[in-house]
Regions:
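Catalytic cores of large soluble enzymes that bind and process phosphate-bearing ligands
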Residues: 1, 71, 165
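Glycine/small-residue-rich loop that forms an oxyanion/phosphate-binding "nest" at active or ligand-binding sites
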Residues: 1-7
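Intrinsic-disorder/low-complexity regions
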Residues: 4, 60-61, 178
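Conserved acidic, metal-coordinating active-site core of Asp-based
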Residues: 8, 12-130, 136-137
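Mg2+-dependent phosphoryl-transfer enzymes with acidic/Ser/Thr/Gly-rich catalytic loops
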Residues: 101-180
Length: 180
């Protein structure tokens, strides 16, 4: 992501109620001193994390790939309005009841799968993906065999070719893979 776009995102997020920015770079995910709830949620999704005093320092020292925004009280969907004009080169997507992802419009899971398929001569119809939230839309669209988890977002369920019989908490992906 462009450094100025990331800085603009940080400035905006600091003004949004219930919002905490997680700046995701090639080296680490960066967050300011989190309370227990935020720490738990960041640790659930990010293996490498660094606590910083100011997120702007992370922008100077790492290649940032996305900015994730965590909302207390599951306010992500109603907070999307704050990010409508986040930047002409950026996309904003609901990635969970408490999460929004901001990234370059030209990047994403779908483009990554397309690049891998092209590199290894895998046909679109032969590619398989699983998703549960709106940040997985391009991923599922890029694969001929697309699965939404049973507990996934309704919009994603309507897009996917299949819906799993079990949730991701019930190992729904493994159940599908065992039955292939």
């Amino acid at each position: 992501m462009d450094k100025q776009d990331v800085l603009n995102c940080i400035d905006l997020i600091e003004k949004v109620p219930y919002a905490t920015a997680v700046v995701c770079g090639a080296k680490s995910a960066y967050v300011t001193e989190p309370d227990e709830e935020i720490r738990y949620n960041v640790e659930m999704y990010y293996e490498r994390k660094t606590i910083v005093k100011d997120l702007r320092e992370a922008v100077k020292n790492d290649a940032i790939v996305k900015v994730a925004v965590y909302f207390k009280k599951e306010k992500a969907e109603e907070s999307m309005k704050y990010f409508e004009n986040v930047g002409k080169n950026l996309s904003t997507v609901l990635s969970g009841a408490s999460w929004i992802d901001i990234a370059n419009k030209t990047e994403g899971k779908g483009n990554a799968v397309k690049a891998i398929c092209e590199k290894y001569s895998i046909a679109h119809e032969e590619a398989m993906a699983f998703g549960d939230y709106l940040n997985d839309m391009s991923l599922l669209e890029s694969c001929g065999e697309s699965y939404c988890m049973k507990n996934g977002h309704p919009t994603l369920k309507s897009l996917a070719k299949y819906v799993t019989e079990k949730t991701n908490d019930e190992n729904g992906v493994m159940e599908v893979l065992k039955n292939l």
